[in-house]
Amino acid sequence: MAGEEERGDGDPVSVVTVRVQYLEDTDPFACANFPEPRRAPTCSLDGALPLSAQIPALHRLLGAPLKLEDCALQVSPSGYYLDPELSLEEQREMLEGFYEEISKGRKPTLILRTQLSVRVNAILEKLYGSSGPELRRSLFSLKQIFQEDKDLVPEFVHSEGLSCLIRVGAAADHNYQSYILRALGQLMLFVDGMLGVVAHSETVQWLYTLCASLSRLVVKTALKLLLVFVEYSENNAPLFIQAVNAVASATGTLPWANLVSILEEKNGADAELLVYTVTLINKTLAALPDQDSFYDVTDALEQQGMEALVQRFLGTAGTDVDLRTQLTLYESALRLEDGDMEEAAAAAAAGGRRERRKPSSEEGKRSRRSLEGGGCPVRAPEPGSTGSASPVGSTPSTGSAPPTNPAFSSTGPASGLLRTSVNLFPTISVGPSVDSSCERSVYKARFLENVAAAETEKQAALAQGRAETLAGATVDDTDGSSGTRELWDSPEPASAPRTPQSPVSRILLRTQRSLEPEPKKPVSPPSPKAEPIQEPPTCVPKLCIGDLDFSDLGEDEDQDTLNVESVEAGKASPFLSSLSPSLSGGPPPPPPPPPPITGSCPPPPPPPLPPPATGSCPPPPPPPPPPIIGSCPPPPPLAAPFTHSALDGPRHPTKRKTVKLFWRELKLTGGPGCSRSRFGPCPTLWASLEPVSVDTARLEHLFESRAKDVLPTKKAGEGRRTMTVVLDPKRSNAINIGLTTLPPVHVIKAALLNFDEFAVSKDGIEKLLTMMPTEEERQKIEEAQLANPDVPLGPAENFLMTLASIGGLAARLQLWAFKLDYESMEREIAEPLFDLKVGMEQLVHNATFRCILATLLAVGNFLNGSQSSGFELSYLEKVSEVKDTVRRQSLLYHLCSLVLQTRPDSSDLYSEIPALTRCAKVDFEQLTENLGQLECRSQAAEDSLRSLAKHELSPALRARLTHFLAQCTRRVAMLRVVHRRVCNRFHAFLLYLGYTPQAARDVRIMQFCHTLREFALEYRTCRERVLQQQQKRATYRERNKTRGRMITETEKFSGVAGEAPNNLSVPVAVGSGPGQGDTDNHASMKSLLTSRPEDATHSRRSRGMVQSSSPVSHTAVGPSAASPEETAASGLPTDTSDEIMDLLVQSVTKSGPRALAARERKRSRGNRKSLRRTLKSGLGDDLVQALGLSKAPGLEV
């Protein structure tokens, strides 16, 4: 019985009682297995614990003969696979039926079985590694495997299973290919499988290649699958054409040659194959979106004698009715596309051929339908021969016959020219073709048409160009463009003779003007003398060390901001102002402060030094007076003014006690009149934060203080938490000590798996190499965990098990250690300083960091019941330690969720502050010592050079050494200046973050950067977890849309499923053992397939009678009962999926093309016709006039 145990604080702990079984499916081809044991035992699962931690206990309870690392949990009977990385509570949204059974008092069943990926890999290995009868048995069983587990289909597709089938089928005979086509047909019945075939063009190419097979059954099955593929979606027809062209290019044959060979009956094709072939061509042509693609397909067919084949079949008395219907549809589509409305009107109304759009400004090429059938001399039509051969566009459109050429409705200056070239060819009826002996006339006609088209386009372009010029001038004048207005309004036409008129020229002119140099201030010339060996010049050099630019460090940063604050506050001694602030050319010291003035107010207590007052203060009676520059600050008021009240809105008094955040509040005394900071327009970062609204009710519920309720529970229960300890104390202590300097365990695992060099340093990797678990330790821990699954592991044991769960741990650590084994001695001082300078800029301008601080401040103010202006950033170390009292999730987790809700475009913060994360690894105190040692070593090198100068040295060597030491001296002095200015900027940065001068002095750079780095690292890890959970939920919703769904349930084939009787349901997945319901469904499908369509009203996709033959039929258990060719004629299929496929094919072949007459095809050329229409029609009067040809007597054009 599923239950919920009561916790001491009154909240239920989600404990679910379920029944568990296992399924021995290590061999995917052993399809006769059933879940064991038959009487499923019960087990209690913790809903808040990840399932990966509970699977070992279930594995031991069942004694399953499965590998523990390959196990997965499947919900029965829905078949949903649970995510082992998540808990049941986290998957509650995906387990509605599971929890619905629990709410009814039932015990749902979980099945322990092999993971999908492992089973798919086993299938692929079996297919690749077997041959002969074993391969035949495997291919024969593959269809049933897809039937039994609907989740296996998408996994098989994603694991390159289609490529495996093609590779195996390419090297096999027609029997194996027949089994592969059966499995592929079952796979294509599922929406996931069909989408996989759509995305895998090699499968479509292979199916088209099989159309040239010598096996009639293989050809028929391939045609069926291609028919279903093309009919499934209109977008599949272009994919099929691409596959045909790819095969033709690879094999060196003509496109569509495989289908034409079937129509030529070279291999003795029967009427059924002919119907499937012509239907496939018609379905492909009906789905094409543009006219050029339509004519490309028809022209390729006509080149191979399609017209002669059509006439031969239509002229034969014994031609099959369905074949005659499909051939008539093909002829009607071609004539309708050419504009022969008289003969194709009835077929268009019945078949629903769409009309293609014919643009009016261009002339296109014609089809070559009559190249092989005989070309008549191109002639001009007689004046009196209009009748049925009248131009299509000469009559206005009516309701029943829309205009085939919209050129007559076009407007513009060129409409008159375009109207003359709309219909260049009369429409004639297509008859049987005769042999052609005048091929020159064909090319002559094509040449004359192109010449006429070029002349027409030239005239239209000139007219359109004039219109665009006038329109462009009007638009420019309306927009108020200064250049254009000057061009039109200028009284002197010769003032701008070269002003461009076209938009491109105007853009070039603006670009040229933008590139003209602007007047600049004169730059002082460099020193005329360059002495490389002498001391650097007296002018202040540019602060650049290698490729590191420190030039933004100004001279005003030579003085520490903290000392300035102390002087202004009266805390600095008078004699400190006389010290020199710089070394090597620094700015002069500031002037001493003026003597104290009588009447100045005393400083706030406690003063470390007697403050010298630098100005007078107003009398104290009124409330806080405005601060005067140079005067001492007034004592703090009783209640510090809240300068960021808009950040949190009105104060909400909490009704319950909440968990408190023990941060150190900042006492910000700056008001709105304070001067801006170097880092932003506001004096502090907190003043610039935007207000964030939080769900106070939810926070109050999550973080309600339960200290009074928890304490009695701890006293009543065990007073000490028990843990599973297996390691000896020495080993355990060594690991625990090592863990103090390493990141958290989950961070280490993620870093090792992703090779994240920022998460673990080189020292950490070397330490991990000494802490690797042995096989003996792993076995002991696993045995202890199985013996006590409810007792958590100790920290050392948990750490070792985490490392042991990483595959190839030793190899990873060694590889990583080698990768990080890199040091740059030359930049060991400059790079950390540059990183610190850049890191401060990155942190200040980071929008994610601001949002995190604002959100955390709003949450903390609500939980604390206060209105703090800010908090010290040192509290970021404790954010992950605070947990809510309901789900025991950390405050950092809720912070990530709130930030993602407020700012979905926010980043992970860690990747945007790489400079600060690098600074966290640098000891800046040691860096200062290294800088001093570098100065001493530089001076000692100079002394050594002087002593060496007394001995014999070549002048060139001496010059080189002198130049080298001079450069070193200059660079060391520059390093000293950079170090001083960067440190002073860091102190100013701390003041901007709200620190007081006294607190800023105690902050170490390394500790500050380390705090931010650890917080950013934990924030990134937690954010990835939140995003992963959101992605899994979204993936589950998308997966559920097609999970187990068959193509018969889609809108395209909905008519097929709707035709079935009420007692017949299309199965989602066929089971391995037939039952009474399956037998009834089977009989109902047989009666449906054998019934005539006249008995009931059918949709257009399923009209007609079912053919007696089927792709495959098996009555025995194994494939050895009969060959595929023999079973093809054995009658109706015995497999329900085969019946569904046959029903789909019959619905496609018995239905006409898609009713899309209201849509027009796109095309890039105008007035393109078929080859038959082009070569059998004469040139019209418009074309003859455009060419300048006169109709002299006896002259034929």
From Swiss-Prot:
Basic residues composition bias: residue spans: 1160-1170
Modified residues (Phosphoserine): S370, S490, S502, S524, S527
SUPFAM superfamilies, alphabetized: ARM repeat (SSF48371), Formin homology 2 domain (FH2 domain) (SSF101447)
One annotated GO molecular function: identical protein binding
Keyword Phosphoprotein belongs to the record: yes
Source species, domain of life: Eukaryota
Compartments where found: Cytoplasm; Cytoplasm, Cytosol; Cytoplasm, Cytoskeleton; Cell projection, Bleb
Biased composition (Pro residues): 522-539, 586-639
One Gene Ontology CC term in the entry: nucleoplasm
Residue ranges constituting the FH2 domain according to the UniProt record: 648-1045
List of residues that carry Phosphothreonine: T499, T722
Region annotation (Interaction with ROCK1) ranges: 644-839
Keyword annotations from UniProtKB, A to Z: Actin-binding, Cell projection, Cytoplasm, Cytoskeleton, Phosphoprotein
Pfam families: FH2 (PF02181), FH3_FHOD1-3 (PF24959), Formin_GBD_N (PF18382)
Sequence ranges of Basic and acidic residues compositional bias: 358-371
Regions that span the bilayer: none
Main subcellular location: cytoplasm
UniProt domain GBD/FH3: residue ranges: 53-462
Record field: compositional bias (Low complexity): 574-585, 1119-1130
Keyword 4Fe-4S: no
Notes on the domains: Regulated by intramolecular binding to a C-terminal auto-inhibitory domain. Effector binding abolishes this interaction and activates the protein. The DAD domain regulates activation via by an autoinhibitory interaction with the GBD/FH3 domain. This autoinhibition is released upon competitive binding of an activated GTPase. The release of DAD allows the FH2 domain to then nucleate and elongate nonbranched actin filaments.
Quaternary assembly: Self-associates via the FH2 domain. Binds to F-actin via its N-terminus. Binds to the cytoplasmic domain of CD21 via its C-terminus. Interacts with ROCK1 in a Src-dependent manner.
Role summary: Required for the assembly of F-actin structures, such as stress fibers. Depends on the Rho-ROCK cascade for its activity. Contributes to the coordination of microtubules with actin fibers and plays a role in cell elongation. Acts synergistically with ROCK1 to promote SRC-dependent non-apoptotic plasma membrane blebbing.
Name of the protein: FH1/FH2 domain-containing protein 1
Taxonomy of the source species: Eukaryota, Metazoa, Chordata, Craniata, Vertebrata
